[in-house]
Amino acid sequence: MSKLQSEAVREAITTIKGKSEEKKRNFVETVELQIGLKNYDPQKDKRFSGSVKLPHIPRPKMKICMLGDAQHVEEAEKMGLSNMDVEALKKLNKNKKLVKKLAKSYHAFLASESVIKQIPRLLGPGLNKAGKFPTLVSHQESLEAKVNETKATVKFQLKKVLCMGVAVGNLSMEEKQLFQNVQMSVNFLVSLLKKNWQNVRCLYLKSTMGPPQRIF
């Protein structure tokens, strides 16, 4: 049972949109769900991690890189998608600094089957440590569909602190779309928690430049 009041969410979204209208920015602001947890010990309790695909893409400009075989690299080129082949990965020479820099340059990675198997050998644990191990793409599925699916997927991962922020939308979306994304994100997050809603201390929605609005 969700304890999230639809009214509170709708009000917060309307306020956020209204405030952003007052001061136009020259970029599209992201809307972030900020989460505070309670009765959770990151040292003892299981640190959860989970991903959910939202109905609407929160960050259309999300940077994705295809680590591909020849065919996937060619497809990525045609789509204007950043890509690297095995030779380019070999050049990083497992250098921790370079792998870290690569991980920081993109929000997510996709990889062909033949490449994904070689990643630990070619790059070491760097991408995994950054929580950005590539998603497998086979030749049977459309690369474009996979890119859109990746853009629509958000990840909740508890690290050492009891608060986190996840991008769940942007201000170019309609209020209804934002509402659907927020609702789905919150319900998914709560399902990951040991005691569900009893572990939620507070929830806020915030646009990049705006003040946070409490929704729970």
Curated annotation (Swiss-Prot):
Gene3D superfamilies to which the protein is assigned, alphabetical: 3.30.190.20, 3.40.50.790
Entries under CDD domains matching the protein: Ribosomal_L1
Matching PROSITE patterns: RIBOSOMAL_L1
GO terms of biological process kind: post-embryonic plant organ development; translation
Keyword Ribosomal protein: yes
Keyword Ribosomal protein: yes
InterPro entries for this protein: eL8/uL1-like (IPR050257), Ribosomal_uL1 (IPR002143), Ribosomal_uL1-like (IPR023674), Ribosomal_uL1/biogenesis (IPR028364), Ribosomal_uL1_3-a/b-sand (IPR016095), Ribosomal_uL1_CS (IPR023673)
Single GO MF descriptor: RNA binding
Family that this chain belongs to: Belongs to the universal ribosomal protein uL1 family.
Protein name: Large ribosomal subunit protein uL1y
Organism: Arabidopsis thaliana
Organism placement in taxonomy: Eukaryota, Viridiplantae, Streptophyta, Embryophyta, Tracheophyta
